[in-house]
Amino acid sequence: MLDGKKLGALIKDKRKEKHLKQTEMAKALGMSRTYLSDIENGRYLPSTKTLSRIAILINLDLNVLKMTEIQVVEEGGYDRAAGTCRRQAL
């Protein structure tokens, strides 16, 4: 299961290494700064597509996610109450 807090912290650390402000990164990704903040703080999990775009922008090796025991769920949603990922029904 994807640990939103670990993933968010990893994204935030890599963003800071690149000396990017949240507003700059959010604009480059075509998302709001508040949504990026929610991702970095573990409140929301990005979709696989969004995570891939983030990884490209900040040079994040997606294999690092496996090493930190973070597993990505394809196009899943995030249940804030349960703090878990869930698959969307087709």
Curated annotation (Swiss-Prot):
Keywords: DNA-binding. The keyword ATP-binding does not apply. InterPro entries: Cro/C1-type_HTH, Lambda_DNA-bd_dom_sf. Residues 22-41 bind DNA. Residues 11-65 form the HTH cro/C1-type domain. GO terms for molecular function: DNA binding. It comes from the Viruses. It holds the Pfam family HTH_3. The keyword DNA repair does not apply. This is ImmF control region 10 kDa protein. The lineage of its organism: Viruses, Duplodnaviria, Heunggongvirae, Uroviricota, Caudoviricetes.
